[in-house]
């Protein structure tokens, strides 16, 4: 089942309460991977995915060599303790942005109309953009999902900062939906850093990327946070055998049953023991499909365990329609026609209606 559809099924009474699936002493799914309706667990994700900052290490070194910069000064940190604040991230991205004359975006003679290499790009899918609103102390919704906060000053400020990367600081390319995939951003060899999900290790970076790549934690505005997601399996309330269904799902959720996807890097484990037991973690990340083991352990495994919050579809209904509307709302901002505040306020009634209709 799609993530965004879970709570609609639960609202219609179609999903069973699965709170008894795991008992005392069991390895359990990470709490952020639990779909809840009115506080009741109704599904767990079958895999975990978190957002990170990925980078083309070959291109980073090339840009540094052209400018006489020490690569270690501009390499994304892999530890949340060392995460860049937003201003540091922007300045670093500007240093890594070069025009056709070799001048970076901090140089007063930089030519923003003729950029050769961009320092960064941010994935602008609406569900991914919420991480920045959360990092700035808000979100699209309140923490308990009872209120739509898309127009909060913190959310608007965070989203405007994403637009400013292109429009003000010239360190990110103009926003297009095609550029969201790492194949298009890092794969172009014209972008040094890009945000996207951990699944890219298995779908692109591991098997297909013809460059050395690395992974870091996301920069932060106020709070060091990433968001997680993963498609769920469910137990229908109409089943005559709920205990057996939960027992089967509990077996299915064991990492051994999806090992090929985990080993490839497409999926991450859901059970907490794979994040806390060194032997299990080592089995998971000690393979050639992954980047440097210590880097991945810190930037992805520990980050997912300690800094991940649930994407809003785990606790809010109607996110598919809400995000589709946001995609349209944001388009005028990416085009430079409106500020984020103008675009959101012009469409606020429609957004609030979508929320209210699905979360009455």
Where are these regions (language model features)?
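Short helices/loops that flank or line small-molecule/ion binding pockets
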Residues: 12, 60, 88-96, 179-194, ...
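Long, aromatic- and glycine/proline-rich binding clefts that accommodate carbohydrate-like moieties
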Residues: 209, 216, 263-328, 332, ...
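Short, solvent-exposed loop/beta-turn-alpha elements that line the ligand-binding surface or hinge
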Residues: 16-28, 71-81, 110-119, 138-157, ...
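Glycine-centered hinge/linker elements that transmit conformational signals in sensory
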Residues: 90-95, 131-133, 143-176, 205, ...
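Hinge/lid segment of periplasmic solute-binding proteins
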Residues: 1-54, 61, 87, 108-114, ...
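Extracytoplasmic/periplasmic substrate-recognition and gating elements
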Residues: 39, 206-273, 328
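Short helix-initiation/N-cap motifs at beta->coil->alpha
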Residues: 3-4, 81-88, 173-187
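Extracytoplasmic/periplasmic solute-binding protein
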Residues: 36-47, 51-53, 81-148
